[in-house]
Structure formats: C-alpha cells, structure tokens
C-alpha cells in the first residue's frame, strides 16, 4: 500500500469508508512502520476498524517503505490540511512524522509501537493500542515545544556522549527492544571514556568533563528512564543534564534514580535550563536525536522552538499524575530489565568461557 493515492483500505479491506467520498469528515492519515516493535500491525488495523469514530473521521492507512518515507507522507498530508497524522511506530517514526507537521494546522497522534516510546509516555498516551485509539476519538489537541540539534528536529531528547554512542551501537544490532538496549548500555559502559566539552549558553561559558550531555524537551529517553525529570513540553526551555565521570559504585544509585525520576538529585549530575546551547568538543562524533544516531561536527547547536507542534493528548491528562506507588512500580520494572540484561550478559560470557575451555581441552587431549 503506497503513498498518498490510497483511499482508506488495507490488506484485508477492513475499512469501508473512503475519504475521497467523505469530504465533510475530518481526514486522518495513519502511517504505519511495519518493522517497529513486536505488536501486530494487522491487529491494530482491526482495532481501528472497530473503535475509530467513523461518523467524525475519514481514515487513510499508509505503510512506510523506507527510512525517511514517513517524512514525505506526513508533509503531503499537512499540505492537504489533514486534521491529524497518526504515527503507528516508535520514536523514530514519530520524529519523522512530527518534523513535517511543525508549524502546520495538522496534529500529531500516536499509537505507540516502539522500543522506548518516550514522547508517548511523557504525553500519558496509553501503551496499549486499543486505549491509544480511544485518545484519538476523545482526546484534546495541545501545542508543545520541540527542539533542534544543528537544525535537525527532535521532540523528546537529544545528546552527545555515551547515550549517543549507545544509540549508534543499538542501530547496528540485529535484535531490537529494551533488553538489547540495556545489553549495549552495560557492555559499552565498561569501555567508554568521558570527554571534555565546552558549553556556551545564554551568555555564559562552562567546561565539563562528562560521560554524557542530554538535552530534554520531554523528561525521558523511553521505558520510563527519566534523564530530565523536571522537563515539560511547553515551558520554552531545554532541560540539560550532565553526567560527570563516575565509578562502578555509583551505578546502583544512578540506575535507581534514573527510573525513580530523581536522577537530578545525584551528586554526579549537573542540571540547568536554557533556550540555546552550543556544545564544543575536540573532534566530530555521533549525536542522537530521539534515540536515532547521526554524525556531526565539533560544534553542536541545540535550541528550543516554542509551541511548534499540535498533538493529540488524553483529555484527563495532568502535568504529573504519577504517585509514589507508580514510581515504585516504574523503578521495579526498570531494575528487572537491568537485572535480566545482567543475567543474560553473564550467561553469555560464561558460555564463551565454557566453549573456550572445551576447545583448549580438545587440543590438549590430541597432543
């Protein structure tokens, strides 16, 4: 199913309404990344057919076919004055769609299907697709800020240093998902060396030796890992988090606070807010924007763009409805993922050692 010429149909012809014949209805385009996450996209289409309000909306379903395809599709839908473009995918798909909708009348909607789902989580959009469809029917349209890193838009977080390096390694991995990300994080953290950065912001200059520098428009990377827990999407400011060099003894507290929304209280963390930030480093390297890696030069300019994107959000969403029990559950879930990754990594290393021992034993027995 290709591009903009398709009128509301999918592979199973589930959708009987044709947007070309329903001019009075609000037009919504659903852009699906077929390879994101593990959720069945065909099942999501069935739920759409069952739950979407067909009296109000004429829907169109389009599959992406390559990297960057969602940018093109969303731009065309914005030109056609679609009411909304709904991303069915992960943070990368959301970024591609949202960058084409900034400063237009077309709103972004999200049915999260990715590994992290950072923006969806910050907006309190349910992780269950059926409930996310309810938000499209009953939600409100809010206007949020977005950021740019060397003129590349981001909507959740961007950064340099270790998190960007891990994003690069993760993009090369055959497997996807949170456990793969944690595995890469644990393995690479043993080898990664902090760099020295010069930061210019709002008229002042500072130097830091840092493990990573994260700039948050939203509060989290995804999977409820809150790198900028105080960040909001409509304050016109970047929340900058600097993680200074640390020891292995700091890892438990950093992990605890990352998932408990209190990492800004750690002694190894420095935070500040600004509208613009220039990061100068000694050599070109990788950066990340919304979890996707990109190579950039020595100078990295980050800035906030105020109130540039319309998004569909839950009607009853508040600025922060989390409570102590929810934070505790988030932390437990986070620790379980870390523990699972540790166990998987240890088992893998033990297997490698065992295999090596077997090979050496065979060599010795042949002598």
Task: Label every model-predicted segment.
Residues 1-8:
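Short, small-residue-biased leader/transition segments that mark boundaries at the very start
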Residues 55, 103-107, 111-215:
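Catalytic core of DAGKc-family lipid kinases
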């Amino acid at each position: 199913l290709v591009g903009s010429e398709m009128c509301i149909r999918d592979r199973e012809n589930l959708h009987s309404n044709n947007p070309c014949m329903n001019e009075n209805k609000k037009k919504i385009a659903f852009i699906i990344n077929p390879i994101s996450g593990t959720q069945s996209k065909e099942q999501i289409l069935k739920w759409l057919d069952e739950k979407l309000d067909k009296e109000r909306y004429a829907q169109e379903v389009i599959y992406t076919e390559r990297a960057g395809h969602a940018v093109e599709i969303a731009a065309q839908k914005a030109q056609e004055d679609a009411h909304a473009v709904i991303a069915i995918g992960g943070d990368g798909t959301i970024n591609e769609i949202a960058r084409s909708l900034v400063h237009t009348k077309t709103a972004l909607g999200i049915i999260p299907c990715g590994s992290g789902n950072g923006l969806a989580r910050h907006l309190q959009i349910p992780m269950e697709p059926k409930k996310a469809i309810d938000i499209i029917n009953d939600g409100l349209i809010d206007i949020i800020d977005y950021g740019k890193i060397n003129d590349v838009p981001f909507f959740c977080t961007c950064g340099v240093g270790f998190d960007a390096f891990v994003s690069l390694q993760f993009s090369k991995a055959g497997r996807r998902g949170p456990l793969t990300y944690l595995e890469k994080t644990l393995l690479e953290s043993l080898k990664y060396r902090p760099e020295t950065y010069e930061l210019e912001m709002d008229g002042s200059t500072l130097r830091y030796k840092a493990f990573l520098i994260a700039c948050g428009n939203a509060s989290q990377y995804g999977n409820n890992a809150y790198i900028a827990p105080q960040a909001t999407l409509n304050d016109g400011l970047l929340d900058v988090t600097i993680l200074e060099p640390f020891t292995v003894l700091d890892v438990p507290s950093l992990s605890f606070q990352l998932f408990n929304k209190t990492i800004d209280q750690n002694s190894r963390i420095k935070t500040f807010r600004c509208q613009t930030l220039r990061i100068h480093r000694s050599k070109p390297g990788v950066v990340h924007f919304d979890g996707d890696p990109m190579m950039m030069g020595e100078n990295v300019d980050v800035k906030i763009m105020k109130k540039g994107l319309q998004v569909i959000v839950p009607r009853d969403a508040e600025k922060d409805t989390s409570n102590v029990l929810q934070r505790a559950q988030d932390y437990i879930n986070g620790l379980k993922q870390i523990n699972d990754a540790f166990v998987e990594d240890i088992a893998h290393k033990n297997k490698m050692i065992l295999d090596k021992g077997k090979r050496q034993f065979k060599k010795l027995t042949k002598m």
